Amino acid sequence: MIFKGVRDGKPYPEHGLSYRDWSRIPPRQIRLDELVTITTVLALDRLLSEDSTFYGDLFPHAVTWKGICYLEDGLHRAVRAALRNRTVLHARLLDLDAVTQHADQA
């Protein structure tokens, strides 16, 4: 299996990050087999499109919640990486566990 799991919808609370907020998070490598997708459907035209990264962020967005890493945006990029036999993906990772822990301590 390419991903750790596939589910429909976000199990974590809304984080409210804008694209500008996401752009401030530096990309890092994430193993594909550690990701759980939150989308069950992939638009084949986005997967095959040469300019699918023309709009939006060049890096997928992932969220860690309760120790699990969820792929929030960029499923087509992750599948494309897997089709090229890559095991990792560069993505922006929001650690909601750390944000929640920090808020609880404040």
Where are these regions (language model features)?
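Hydrophobic transmembrane signal anchors and adjacent membrane-proximal interface regions, especially
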Residues: 3-5, 27-32, 36-38, 83, ...
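Short alpha-helix boundary/capping and kink motifs at helix termini
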Residues: 15-70, 82
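A short, basic-hydrophobic beta/loop patch
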Residues: 56-106
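N-terminal leader/domain-start detector
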Residues: 1-21
